[in-house]
Design a protein with these regions (language model features):
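GH16 jelly-roll
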Residues: 1-268
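Extracellular ligand-binding interfaces
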Residues: 337-370
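Aromatic (Trp/Tyr/Phe) and Gly/Pro-enriched flexible surface segments
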Residues: 263-318, 404, 408
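Extracellular carbohydrate recognition and processing domains
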Residues: 133, 358-387
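Extra-cytoplasmic beta-strand recognition segments
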Residues: 12, 89-97, 284, 315-347, ...
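Beta-strand-rich interaction surfaces with strong enrichment in secreted/lumenal proteins
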Residues: 77-84, 160-168, 204-205, 309-311, ...
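Conserved aromatic beta-strand anchor motif in extracellular beta-sandwich/beta-rich domains
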Residues: 194-196, 349-355, 409
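Extracellular beta-strand ligand-recognition surfaces/modules
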Residues: 105-110, 226, 284, 377-411
Length: 412
């Protein structure tokens, strides 16, 4: 049994303290816009935190995908980094993963002295990362002993959890992810073991780091789409309830990784904790290259101005939007507002249940007619085990045009 040296515990009951956390503005990797303090929020509102199923406070980390109207913010995430460094021990986080593909939600340790040769590099990194292979039914753990770049030196071991029978990691529930890092080789205990909700996922016995490192939690945009998928969303959020590091008295060398950069997270005060709206450009305000951003199909244009924008959909036309990596058992509330319907037919809005490009079924529909407009809601649950994605459909019958806005969809 390891000897416990000390415990670091953060439940954000005092918000995000800049003396404890660096609110990241760092950028790494290619083809992204880094991380921004503008994307980091917290709530200590007792009622809101309790209603969200958390204790203390909640850290909220935003991410912008490719369907964000402001292209300068696309592929921009958020991260928190401890100023303190830690050695071997058990690292735990209770969080809700950011539920969209194209980004990487991660919990990791990191230190590098910047050495560029095998003789001079000092390095330490252990990762938990998701999704994998464009699926939220897969996640991975990686242990790095040394790393310069993928061409020179990358001493690492990765284990992957492929959990096809479980509900996806993006099910909207709190899950506790953990890894236990041991360096007590003299007693035969050197390695890293990963856990989800207390259940062992895998272990690495090679390439175990030897240096103390800072701890990171957040989301970012890797350039490799075969890894994380395509970020075809507008904005999305991950949530952190608490983080705990139980440090062991195992052998370790001094490393580093905490920085002195200072930025403040935003206190939400009494405002609601922002929720994930799965619809992109649901007010139809963003056009790009003459087409509605995030929507496929013909016959739809953006009308109105300012905050009062809407979709003008011609008669007998259909627009669709894919929402990937959504699985059986997930339940949603879809809502929409019809401003005006002209003609004797209907405007329908519904979800199709997709397995790749094959339609496996569909939800009931929100229906509008010339005499029945306004705002309507629809609850539906994906009921087919093979479903991998949703496709949202907005369509008009022949001879009927529609003005529609405020399409939203939230996980129940």
């Amino acid at each position: 049994e390891p000897t416990i040296k000390g415990t670091f515990y953060e439940d954000f009951s005092n918000g995000i303290d800049s003396d404890i956390w660096e609110v990241s503005s760092q950028k790494w990797g290619a083809d992204n816009n880094g991380t921004s303090p503008d994307n980091v929020f917290y709530s200590t509102d007792e009622t809101r935190v309790k209603n969200a199923g958390a204790t203390g406070g909640i850290a909220v980390l935003r991410s912008y995908g490719d369907l964000q109207a402001n292209s300068a913010k696309r592929r921009q995430g958020a991260a928190l980094i401890t100023r303190q460094t830690f050695g071997p021990g058990k690292y735990e986080v209770r969080m809700k993963v950011l539920p969209r593909l194209g980004q990487c939600t991660a919990f990791w340790t990191y230190y590098s002295n910047g050495g560029q040769t095998p003789e001079t590099i000092k390095y330490s990194e252990i990762d938990i990362e998701m999704p994998m292979e464009g699926s939220f039914k897969k996640w991975s753990g990686t242990s790095y002993e040394r790393f310069i770049d993928w061409n020179i030196l990358a001493d690492r071991q990765t284990v992957m959890a492929d959990e096809p029978e479980k509900g996806g990691l993006n099910d909207g529930q709190w899950h506790t992810y953990a890894f236990e890092w041991r360096t007590d080789a003299a007693n035969g205990d050197r390695g890293v073991i990963w856990y989800r909700d207390g259940e062992k996922m895998g272990e690495a016995r090679e390439f175990v780091p030897n240096y103390k490192a800072a701890l990171w939690v957040g989301n970012w945009f890797p350039p490799d789409k075969s890894w994380v998928g395509i970020p075809d969303f507008e904005e999305a959020y991950m949530y952190v309830d608490w983080i705990r590091v139980t440090e062991y008295d195992d052998p370790v060398q001094e490393g580093g990784g905490g920085s002195t950069a200072r930025a403040e997270a935003t206190d939400l005060g009494t405002k609601p904790i922002p929720q994930n709206d799965y619809i992109s450009n649901g007010k139809f305000s963003s056009m790009e290259n003459g087409v509605l951003l995030g929507w496929e199909g013909e016959g739809g244009t953006s009308s109105g101005s300012g905050s009062d924008t809407y979709l003008n959909l011609e008669a007998g036309k259909k627009l669709t939007q894919m929402i990937r990596a959504q699985y059986s058992g997930y339940s949603f509330t879809l809502s929409a507002e019809a401003l005006k319907i002209v003609g004797s037919g209907k405007c329908k809005i519904y979800a199709e249940y997709m397995f790749g490009s094959v339609r496996m079924g569909k939800s009931e529909a929100i229906e509008f007619t010339a005499s029945d407009t306004g705002k309507k809601n629809l609850n539906f649950t994906i009921d087919n085990n093979r479903v991998t994605d949703l496709r949202i459909v907005v369509e008009t019958e022949e001879g009927t045009t529609a003005q529609v806005t405020n399409i939203e969809m939230f996980l129940n």
